[in-house]
């Protein structure tokens, strides 16, 4: 964002010309000239945690905090079938980050979304450092593409200034679909009619997430659609699988049984979670996964949700899990 002085527009001009630049992205020109290049910064594993637990007692956020923790610079994916609660989860995550880390620059990017969903998110998540950028489903694919490229470039410039930025993208599947309709045909086609060249820019967007050794971080949490009945959506997910370092999987069967949050705990997780969790939290996470092994998924998740409901905080939950394990060993 460029701030400066504008002269009066003339009769034949649509806009007044900018004749003096004061600031770029909220920084003075001296600092802007000294900023490093994003590609030259050193990426490292996320080592500073984003706590999602709040006083509102959101069970979903408490589960994510232990099962699949998020750090500054995380490249995370929320894998979800339709109607499993991905948008609600993304909204809760945004509220938690806004409350616990108000210094972070937050950009919520909604691609190919319903207009009423956009209004809901704009009204629910408001703050000085929050931007809701959107391109609804009635816009052209070229507009989706242009909006997403502007967002990622703005985020990179903020990281170059040493700021911590988080992008919440809904969804990377629809972004890939938009690129599939706009890229020149490469002559090759994956199953589902997806051109391999269409995945290059969405991968660049997702791959930009990183924690910088020199300071600053870019966190990207993107939703990916699966089991929609479209082969292309499954191919997009398979292409992105393994590129992230955190995955949160939602289960359709759990949501159909009205078990919310419908998080598949066994399939969800974070790489190098030991850098983010304390020893007690790590132990509780291992115990939960071990105890779930061999149980029916629905029963296991329901038991864990009941345990979360009976405790007021994650600290109390970890203590309770430790006691259960001690009694079990006896």
Q: How would you name each of these model-derived features?
A:
Residues 7-78, 84:
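P-loop NTP-binding catalytic core
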Residues 84-85, 93-330:
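P-loop NTPase catalytic core
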Residues 78-79, 91:
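Active-site scaffold segments
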Residues 1-3:
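Short nucleic-acid-contacting surface segments enriched for D/E, G, S/T with interspersed K/R
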């Amino acid at each position: 964002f460029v701030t400066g002085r504008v002269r009066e527009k003339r009769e034949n001009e649509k806009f007044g010309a900018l004749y003096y630049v004061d600031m770029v992205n909220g920084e003075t020109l001296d600092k802007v000239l000294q900023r490093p290049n994003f590609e030259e910064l050193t990426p490292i594993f996320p080592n500073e945690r984003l706590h999602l637990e709040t006083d509102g007692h959101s069970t979903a956020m408490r589960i994510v905090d232990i099962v699949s923790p998020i750090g500054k610079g995380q490249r995370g994916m929320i894998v979800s079938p339709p109607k499993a609660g991905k948008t609600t989860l993304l909204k809760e995550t945004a509220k938690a980050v806004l409350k616990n880390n108000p210094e972070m620059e937050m950009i919520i990017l909604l691609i190919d979304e319903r207009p009423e969903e956009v209004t809901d998110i704009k009204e629910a998540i408001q703050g000085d450092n929050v931007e809701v950028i959107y391109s609804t489903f009635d816009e052209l694919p070229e507009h989706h593409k242009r909006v997403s490229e502007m967002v990622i470039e703005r985020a990179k410039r903020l990281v170059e200034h040493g700021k911590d930025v988080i992008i919440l993208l809904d969804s990377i599947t629809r972004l890939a679909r938009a690129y599939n309709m706009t890229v020149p045909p490469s002559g090759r086609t994956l199953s589902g009619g997806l051109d391999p060249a269409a995945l290059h820019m969405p991968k660049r967007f997702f791959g930009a997430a990183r924690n910088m050794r020199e300071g600053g971080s870019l966190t990207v949490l993107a939703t990916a659609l699966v089991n929609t009945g479209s082969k292309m959506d499954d191919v997009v997910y398979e292409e992105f699988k393994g590129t992230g370092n955190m995955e949160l999987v939602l289960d359709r069967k759990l949501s159909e049984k009205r078990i919310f949050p419908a998080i598949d705990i066994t399939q969800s997780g974070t790489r190098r979670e030991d850098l983010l969790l304390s020893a007690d939290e790590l132990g509780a996470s291992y115990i939960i996964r071990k105890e779930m092994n061999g149980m029916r998924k629905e029963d296991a998740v329901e038991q864990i949700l009941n345990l979360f409901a009976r405790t007021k905080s994650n600290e109390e939950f970890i203590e309770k899990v430790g006691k259960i394990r001690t009694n079990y060993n006896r």
